[in-house]
Swiss-Prot record:
Component of the nexin-dynein regulatory complex (N-DRC) a key regulator of ciliary/flagellar motility which maintains the alignment and integrity of the distal axoneme and regulates microtubule sliding in motile axonemes. Belongs to the DRC3 family. Residues 204-242, 333-393 form a coiled coil. It is found in: Cytoplasm, Cytoskeleton, Cilium axoneme; Cell projection, Cilium; Cytoplasm, Cytoskeleton, Flagellum axoneme; Cell projection, Cilium, Flagellum. The gene is Drc3. Pfam families: LRR_9 (PF14580). Its main location: cytoplasm. InterPro entries: Cilia_flagella_integrity, Leu-rich_rpt, Leu-rich_rpt_typical-subtyp, LRR_dom_sf. It comes from Mus musculus (Mouse). Component of the nexin-dynein regulatory complex (N-DRC). Interacts with DRC1. Interacts with TCTE1/DRC5. Interacts with DRC7. One of its GO terms (cellular component) is axoneme. Keywords: Cell projection, Cilium, Coiled coil, Cytoplasm, Cytoskeleton, Flagellum, Leucine-rich repeat, Repeat. SUPFAM superfamilies: L domain-like. Transmembrane segments: none annotated. This is Dynein regulatory complex subunit 3.
Length: 523
């Protein structure tokens, strides 16, 4: 799909291009001048227009994390990429490019309007994550298979579709097929769907649609079951007790234990293993239930902390707003009085009073902020102690339970070794009545061989138990450290932001006063 500007030199989406685009589309006049002076942060941009730029590759958009509308039409883009961070995107135009495949849209879960018309796309897929999609423009591509239409049934919000100019749109059954299989569609190829035609299409394809709905219902049920399992697993991971609500840890001990599996053929070992497994799983379940209980306590502690923090911040903000409101009321009266004053000495006196007033406001707001910092610091320190104590208690009790698992393993090891030695003696004396597999009998050549085999099995089991303990302890300690670190960093950022706001407000007040002095009075 060659375009006149394809012969131009391809451009790179670098910072200069993005800054220029943001500047051109930003606020104008006084607001625009202020924005240019202070600089517009990419994360604050909601809409970005980059059409007709001869862009070959999408890049450097990761900072536009709050972008809602992106226009990249009429370029020479060959691949959909570089959009991963734009999770708030609602509207995306990639029409009139050289795109051959739909890809790179998995994180755009809020996208409602997508235009891919006038490209080289031959297959409709890789849109599964776009659950809010309402408008899809795919006109003038290379789509030829009617099955692409059935794929679009997974988008419950889809109301507008454009496929005109594709080979598929030339099929005799094109419209009837779409009317039947996309029953909620309102507009097709820029025309409203004819309701009579829709009903006729439904009747014609009724049997096929019923079969398809049945398959979709079964698939949906499986997906919901898998989703529920995954959600439960995530809950268990948050509690650091995943896969401890059953025989998973015990089974993992034997999954790589070649010698242990051979030894299970010895007389009496099966019964020994069953009893061992039952007791081991009970301890794992105790760890699991205790972990969920402690996770709930940590959640309550964190929720209470966040509520206290927000309450303190809001109360402080209300006090600050009250001080500012009183200041602004008085300041406005003073400004009006200065404008009406004709005596120069009185004007200078009032200007001095206004400047002092601004200074007093600054001091008041900064004192409020310092008080808040101290209050929040105390709250954070209390929370840090509480959450650290909860984590420490959790680790201590879990380690005690895991020690019981080791005791069971040690006891099992002793019993297994006893059975193995007795079996060796029977084999050497020719008193072994039971048949054993050849690879098992090969272990009983001498005492050292069988003792080493039992010991190797025991070492594997202890290693699995130790690794699971390390995983749990490391996991919750890391979580606690990262949480506390983030809380401290967030508070530092909040404080810096607030101090900056106070300084900017005070500077603005002083600038307004200075402009009044230099303008209204001297003139």
């Amino acid at each position: 799909m060659s375009r006149p500007y394809d012969s131009m030199e391809p451009k790179v989406m670098d910072d200069d291009m993005l800054k220029a685009a943001v500047g051109e589309q930003g606020p104008q006049e006084e607001a625009g001048q202020l924005a240019k002076q202070e600089g517009i942060l990419f994360k604050d941009v909601l809409s970005l227009q980059l059409d007709f730029q001869n862009i070959l590759r999408i890049d450097n958009l990761w900072q536009f994390e709050n972008l809602k509308k992106l226009q990249l039409n009429n370029n020479i883009i060959e691949r959909i990429e570089g959009l991963t961070n734009l999770i708030h995107l609602v509207w995306l135009d990639l029409s009139f490019n050289n795109i051959e495949a739909i890809e790179g849209l998995d994180t755009l879960v809020n996208l409602e309007d997508l235009s891919l018309s006038n490209n080289r796309i031959s297959k409709v897929d890789s849109l599964d994550a776009l659950v809010k999609l309402q408008v899809l423009s795919l006109g003038n591509n290379q789509i030829s298979n009617m099955m692409n239409i059935i794929y679009l049934r997974r988008f419950p919000c889809l109301r507008t579709l454009s496929l005109a100019g594709n080979p598929v749109s030339e099929a005799e059954e094109y419209k009837m097929f779409i009317y039947a299989y996309l029953s909620d569609l309102v507009y097709l190829d820029f025309r409203r769907v004819d309701e009579q035609m829709r009903e006729m299409a439904k009747m014609k394809h009724q049997y096929s649609i019923d079969e398809l709905k049945h398959r979709e219902a079964q698939l949906q049920m499986k997906l919901e079951e898998e989703q529920a399992k995954q959600e439960k697993l995530e809950e268990h991971k948050m509690a650091f007790v995943e896969h401890l609500n059953g025989p998973f840890l015990f089974d993992s001990m034997y999954s790589e234990d070649v010698e242990g599996n051979k030894l299970s053929y010895l007389p009496g070992v099966r019964e020994l293993l069953e009893a061992y497994k039952d007791k081991f799983v009970i301890i794992c379940l105790n760890i699991f239930e205790y972990g969920l209980n402690q996770q709930e306590k940590r959640k309550v502690e964190l929720d209470t902390f966040n509520e206290c923090i927000q309450e303190a911040i809001l109360e402080n903000q209300d006090q600050g707003k009250l001080k500012v409101a009183k200041f602004e009321e008085k300041h406005l009266l003073n400004l009006n009085a200065i404008r009406e004053e004709t005596d120069l000495s009185n004007i200078e006196k009032k200007l001095t009073e206004c400047t002092e007033s601004i200074g007093e406001l600054f001091n008041t707001l900064m004192i409020l902020e310092m008080q808040l910092v101290e209050q929040l610091e105390e709250t954070i320190n209390i929370f840090e102690r509480n959450i650290t104590d909860l984590v420490g208690l959790f680790i201590e009790n879990v380690q005690s339970l895991i020690a019981q698992c080791r005791d069971l393993e040690n006891h099992h090891h002793e019993k297994l070794l006893e059975i193995a030695i007795n079996t060796l003696e029977k084999i050497l004396k020719g008193e072994m009545d039971e048949d054993l597999p050849d690879d098992v009998r090969a272990l009983f050549v001498d005492k050292d061989t069988i003792v080493n085999a039992v010991g190797a099995s025991h070492d594997i089991h202890l290693l699995k138990i130790d690794n699971r303990e390390d995983e749990l302890v490391t996991g919750i300690n890391s979580w606690c450290a990262h949480l506390v670190d983030k809380i401290h960093k967030d508070e530092i950022m909040r404080n810096r932001k607030r101090v900056k706001e106070i300084n900017q407000f005070v500077d603005h007040m002083q600038s307004e006063l200075d402009n009044l002095e230099c303008g209204d009075i001297i003139d």
